[in-house]
């Protein structure tokens, strides 16, 4: 994937997940797709911890470097994994931190690992070490692009050391802040001057997310609307003033995510039947199979899908509140996802209330998700906030019209009344009004199919995101070198 083109910048992606190997949400999708989409412009390589899912993958790992310890952060090795398509992944090998059953952030019981501050400080320090050429891996980045709180200390360590390599920090979800006690400072080798309001201090504790924002050269988030929302108290999660100041300084911008080309109903091998724009027979076949999969009765009414993490942010309580309205009007709901135990139980109870009309599968696999997008008529996304969201783009690509709250990336990627249905207030009444519009459209097949056609044709590929990222990379590198950037 890398090229000898001297104009290409070398960029190190620092992330806690990548969809090829380990994924809990949209961060994993972006970490897999954006470096590949960027390949023709820059040499982007990915740094990720050596979780079991990474170490046990079918792709061989070759040890190429070693890094010493720092404070309580243990020494580690750097492995190189070459993906079949050429993407280079650097693996941070440290069994005492990462060789554990469970997910990237916690055990199978859902509890976070108590030493996450050590685990992800080690990731941030490794990125800083690679940027300083301490790993001696014969590749040194021109820019480090860190993602979300687990990578937040990468720009911080680089700043504290006086490293000149520019850094970009992307916020995928401001609510996850990587907060730990001030007493962790000595373990992490954090200088005392960092624990100030303009540094990583956060209401008497310290935040990895704030560190990434405070010490990076520039901050992005994953939609233009969300970039505006997080400067307000309603969405700022206690950081609105800090982010408003960054905006005023021209240091915060929104760049929307894209989706990869595999989301194509005409060619997707996971579907029960392929279909293209204007050909709805295949969609009907998928709908029948989805109903069977979820134990729903045969029906001529609309099929609504929920493909989501089952957490408070996603507004599942609102879907619960409008479920009777949907069923009474002839609709059915298929729900798939995993998340907080109380949300999972609420969805199970919802299915018991409406047997044959609402079906739930706790867990997640992408094959079922793709089939649900292909078979459903509408996707339900009543999120209280949504930094970008990918499901609404996947759904539109497969002809499923989103019924979604007018927030964040949903506002930027759904055209109300054209490719979906938006509602403003996080209330059941506002949600119900949008659903009534969806039911009315469903009653007129020509109108429904026209909206499906427009949704399936919406331009959600990564090309739209790559260009502003590439320009920002070039601008930050040029600034670090003391050059003037020209567009």
Swiss-Prot record:
Binding-site residues, ADP-alpha-D-glucose: 23
GO MF entries: alpha-1,4-glucan glucosyltransferase (ADP-glucose donor) activity; alpha-1,4-glucan glucosyltransferase (UDP-glucose donor) activity
Class of this enzyme: transferase
Transferase is among the record's keywords: yes
Pathway: Glycan biosynthesis; glycogen biosynthesis
Catalytic activity: [(1->4)-alpha-D-glucosyl](n) + ADP-alpha-D-glucose = [(1->4)-alpha-D-glucosyl](n+1) + ADP + H(+)
Transmembrane spans: none
Any matching Pfam family: Glyco_transf_5
EC number: 2.4.1.21
UniProt keyword annotations, A-Z: Glycogen biosynthesis, Glycosyltransferase, Transferase
Source organism, top-level taxon: Bacteria
Biological process annotations from GO: glycogen biosynthetic process
Function: Synthesizes alpha-1,4-glucan chains using ADP-glucose.
Family: Belongs to the glycosyltransferase 1 family. Bacterial/plant glycogen synthase subfamily.
Name listed for the protein in its UniProt record: Glycogen synthase
Gene assigned in the entry: glgA
